[in-house]
Amino acid sequence: VDEQLPRTIMNIFEK
């Protein structure tokens, strides 16, 4: 499952 990579990136961008 490669759905945690983009999720982490989006989280950092949201900060």
Swiss-Prot record:
Superkingdom of origin organism: Eukaryota
Protein known as: Unknown protein 26
Originating species: Pseudotsuga menziesii (Douglas-fir)
